[in-house]
């Protein structure tokens, strides 16, 4: 399906309309940002790697009953997706303390949490995507309690499926953030799942295989993304 006009350009992707008003083409860029856009750069072939990783993980989740916006991969950088109305929230899932949570709560990075933590952030770059709670989200009109129930149920399944899947590849799923969209009365998993949106550590060495390598100037960023793709595809 051919793409037409560009409807939206974000930090990591471009969204194009198609001849079908219900479908869009999503193009994955090599641009990399961190700290709400304060740090910017490029990671060679990141768009290709993230498109391939996301396509595979969304297909996996669909097989486990998670409804997503993903239709099919069109090329190395493009995928066909349902046109959704994005819920203006990010759902953050934390299995191990790292990043902002470790800093905020004074925890050592790598601390094994006693239970999985679910957080919400309000998608607003100007505000720095602030953390909010469920009642905030409903009070400001971002969602409803009924919709949140569906979002949390899907999120729990995503975490359960991905934790087990990554474990089989020798990868520890530290945390991740996901987004959802509305489509014909349903709530679908949208956006992407990749080393841009997940913290992924090698189970044996705790080597970071995700965007923290870019955030923290650790080097070998592309190599880490390639390692994730190779492991999940069995190469």
Swiss-Prot record:
Tell me the Gene Ontology biological-process terms attached to this UniProt entry.
'de novo' IMP biosynthetic process; cobalamin biosynthetic process
Which residues, if any, are the signal sequence?
none
Give GO MF terms, alphabetically.
ATP binding; phosphoribosylaminoimidazolesuccinocarboxamide synthase activity
Record field: catalytic activity? 5-amino-1-(5-phospho-D-ribosyl)imidazole-4-carboxylate + L-aspartate + ATP = (2S)-2-[5-amino-1-(5-phospho-beta-D-ribosyl)imidazole-4-carboxamido]succinate + ADP + phosphate + 2 H(+)
Which InterPro entries does this entry report, sorted A to Z? SAICAR_synt/ADE2_N, SAICAR_synt_PurC, SAICAR_synth, SAICAR_synthetase, SAICAR_synthetase_CS
Q: Which domain of life is it from?
A: Bacteria
Q: Which CDD domains match?
A: SAICAR_synt_PurC
According to UniProt, this protein's pathway is: Purine metabolism; IMP biosynthesis via de novo pathway; 5-amino-1-(5-phospho-D-ribosyl)imidazole-4-carboxamide from 5-amino-1-(5-phospho-D-ribosyl)imidazole-4-carboxylate: step 1/2
For the protein in the UniProt heading, the enzyme class is ligase
Tell me which NCBIfam families the record gives: purC
Q: Which HAMAP family match?
A: SAICAR_synth (MF_00137)
Protein family according to the UniProt entry? Belongs to the SAICAR synthetase family.
Q: What is this protein called?
A: Phosphoribosylaminoimidazole-succinocarboxamide synthase
State the species of origin: Clostridium acetobutylicum (strain ATCC 824 / DSM 792 / JCM 1419 / IAM 19013 / LMG 5710 / NBRC 13948 / NRRL B-527 / VKM B-1787 / 2291 / W)
The organism's taxonomy opens as:
Bacteria, Bacillati, Bacillota, Clostridia, Eubacteriales
């Amino acid at each position: 399906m051919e793409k037409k006009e560009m409807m939206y350009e974000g930090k990591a992707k471009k969204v194009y309309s198609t001849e079908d008003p219900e479908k869009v083409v999503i193009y994955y860029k090599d641009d990399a940002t961190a700290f709400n856009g304060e740090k910017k750069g490029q990671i060679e072939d990141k768009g290709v790697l993230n498109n391939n990783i996301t396509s595979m993980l969304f297909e996996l989740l669909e097989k486990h009953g998670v409804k997503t916006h993903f239709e099919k991969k069109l090329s190395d950088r493009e995928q066909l997706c349902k046109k959704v109305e994005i819920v203006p929230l990010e759902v953050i899932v934390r299995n191990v303390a790292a990043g902002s949570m470790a800093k905020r709560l004074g925890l050592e990075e790598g601390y094994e949490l006693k239970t999985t933590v679910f957080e919400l952030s309000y998608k607003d770059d100007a505000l720095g995507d602030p953390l909010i709670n469920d009642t905030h989200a409903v009070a400001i009109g971002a969602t409803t309690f009924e919709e949140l129930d569906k979002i949390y149920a899907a999120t729990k399944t995503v975490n359960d499926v991905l934790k087990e899947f990554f474990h089989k590849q020798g990868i520890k799923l530290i945390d991740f953030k996901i987004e959802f969209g509305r489509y014909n009365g349903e709530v679908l998993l949208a956006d992407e799942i990749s080393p841009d949106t997940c913290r992924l550590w090698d189970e044996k060495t705790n080597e970071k295989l995700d965007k923290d390598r870019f955030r923290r100037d650790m080097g070998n960023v592309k190599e880490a993304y390639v390692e994730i793709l190779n492991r999940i595809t069995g190469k």
